[in-house]
C-alpha cells in the first residue's frame, strides 16, 4: 500500500463560504485543495439573481490568498418568484452554473425557499432550455414527517415528478444520506447525479447521539443509521460517474453550535480531501478517489477536469481544536483528533 497518493486537483461541488469578515478564512481553506467550488447561495438576503451572484463572486475573489487560482462557480437561490428571465440572464452571465432548490424551512437560511415545487416549473423549464443545472436539497419540511424520513419522502413526493416532467434537465441530488437516494440516482437517467459529503461517509447517527449529544456532528440532512452509511460508501467507491464530491462544509461560530438550539452544519473544508481519503481507504478503494473527487463532477457539469495535481501523504497529524472565523472561532469536524492523511504543501 502506497504512502503517497497523487490526484488531479479535485473540485468541491457543494460548499458554504458564508460572507463578510469570515471569507478570508473560508476561502483560504477551500482554495488550499480545490480548483473550483459550487458556492451555495443561502446568504441573508439570498443570492437571487445574476447581479447579486456577481457581487458575491467578487467578494470571494477578493478574499483569495495572493497566489490562488481558485474559481468560485456561482448558484442562484430559487424562490417562488424566480422567473425564466432570471434564469436566462444568469446563464448568459457565464459565471452562474446552477440554481438551487431549497424547500422553505429545510435548512440554514432557507426561509425564502420554495413553498411549492409547482411554482418554479416555469423556471425549471427555462433551466432545461438553456442547460442550467438544478441542485436539490431533498427533504420535505412538514412537521409530521420524521426528520430521518424526510429525504425518502421528498424523493417519492417531489423529485420523481421533477425528473419525469423535465427529462432533459440536469439534476444534482445534493448531500444524499440514504440507501433510497442511492437507488433513485442509480435508476434515474444519465441526467441525474448526486454529491456525497465526507461526514456522511465516515459517520452515522450513533456518532452524534451515543454517549452524549455531539453538536458538531449535527447537520442537515441529518446523519442516518449505519445501513445508509454503508450504501453511501458503496456508491462513492463504485466508480460510477453519477456520484461525486460535495463537502457541504457549513461553518457556524462555536457559540451557535454549542447551544440549546444549535445550528446544523459540519465544517470540513480545512481537511476535506484528507477526510475523503480516510473513507475510501476504509473500503480499500483509494484507486477510486480521483474519479469521485476530480473527474465525475466536471464531466457532469460539462467542464474540463483540472490539469494540475495534489499529493496526499500517509502522515498522521492532529486537527486543530478550533479555527478563526472572522472575529469568532469555528470548531472543525474531528477537532483535536488524529487524521491519517496529510495534504503535501508546495513551497
UniProtKB/Swiss-Prot annotation:
Pathway: Pyrimidine metabolism; UMP biosynthesis via de novo pathway; (S)-dihydroorotate from bicarbonate: step 3/3. Its cofactor is Zn(2+). The active site is at 248. Substrate binds at residues 16-18, 42, 137, 220, 252, 264. The keyword Oxidoreductase does not apply. It comes from the Bacteria. It catalyses: (S)-dihydroorotate + H2O = N-carbamoyl-L-aspartate + H(+). The modification N6-carboxylysine is found at residue 100. One of its GO terms (molecular function) is zinc ion binding. One of its GO terms (biological process) is 'de novo' pyrimidine nucleobase biosynthetic process. InterPro entries: Amidohydro-rel, DHOdimr, Dihydroorotase_CS, Metal_Hydrolase. Transmembrane segments: none annotated. One of its GO terms (cellular component) is cytosol. Zn(2+) 2 binds at residues 100, 137, 175. Pfam families: Amidohydro_1 (PF01979). The keyword Mitochondrion does not apply. SUPFAM superfamilies: Metallo-dependent hydrolases. It is an enzyme of class 3 (hydrolase). Zn(2+) 1 binds at residues 14, 16, 100, 248. Binds 2 Zn(2+) ions per subunit. Keywords: Hydrolase, Metal-binding, Pyrimidine biosynthesis, Zinc. Its EC number is 3.5.2.3. PROSITE patterns: DIHYDROOROTASE_1, DIHYDROOROTASE_2. Catalyzes the reversible cyclization of carbamoyl aspartate to dihydroorotate. Homodimer. This is Dihydroorotase. It comes from Pseudomonas syringae pv. syringae (strain B728a).
